[in-house]
Design a protein with these regions (language model features):
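Conserved SGNH/GDSL esterase-like catalytic core that processes O-acyl groups on lipids
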Residues: 23-150, 154
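Structural alpha-beta junctions
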Residues: 51-56, 158, 171-174
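Bacterial Sec-dependent N-terminal signal peptides
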Residues: 1-20
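Active-site segments of SGNH/GDSL-like serine hydrolases
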Residues: 126-136, 140-141, 163-190
Length: 198
């Protein structure tokens, strides 16, 4: 079901971007997300169908917008790496790598790869994540922070604000699209299940 929704959203993105320009061969595509975006999934299909010049995807399964208190910066000297692991473990390095699997670190990696010339600067960037986030509070705080240094990145809203604004500040000509999951209450889920069983 999630793949169908993302494919529909991807097709919608294609239509929006196509309305703005007809020649995608000179445009570069970047994206960040979780498991539904990682690798060569919907984003690669969009790039191939529309003929974008490049595809730069830093999405990793199990990722979140919200950082952990011990999340490391991508360029820090002791950076442990990033892991999409999800099975229970007590391995300290693996746990640190999982705590680094957040949009802030992905975006730091993305910018580093662009600055190093590995990939070109993006003309279109899509964030497609949030389904793994559990810290959904802090929206007002994230929006009212004056600078990125003031943003509390340990919430979904703060992490999203930091990531989106960082892309816009580093690539001001880039068009940014954000696809978030639509949260559903437990009551709604139970009603849906009850209706489906009738």
């Amino acid at each position: 079901m999630k793949r169908i929704i993302f494919l529909m959203l991807g097709w919608g993105l294609c239509l929006i971007v196509q309305a703005q320009t007809t020649n995608f061969s000179k445009l570069n595509f970047g994206c960040d997300g979780s498991s539904t975006t990682s690798g060569n999934q919907w984003s690669k299909t969009v790039v191939d169908l529309l003929g974008f010049a490049s595809h730069h995807n830093v999405a990793v399964g199990s990722s979140t917008f919200a950082c952990h208190p011990d999340t490391q910066d991508y360029n820090s000297d002791n950076f442990a790496g990033i892991s999409d692991g999800w099975k229970p473990t007590k391995d300290k390095k693996e746990l640190q790598m999982r705590h680094n699997n957040v949009s802030k670190v992905h975006i730091q990696k993305f910018i580093s790869e662009v600055k190093d010339g590995v990939y070109p600067a993006p003309d279109v960037f899509v964030f497609a994540m949030g389904s793994n986030d559990t810290k959904l509070d802090g929206v007002a705080e994230a929006l009212s922070a004056r600078t990125l240094d003031d943003v509390n990145v340990t919430t979904m809203a703060g992490g999203a604000r930091w990531a989106i604004q960082t892309i816009l500040e580093n690539f001001p000509e880039c068009r940014v699209f954000v696809w978030l999951p639509i949260p559903v209450s437990y009551t709604h889920l139970r009603a849906h299940e009850t209706g489906r069983n009738l």
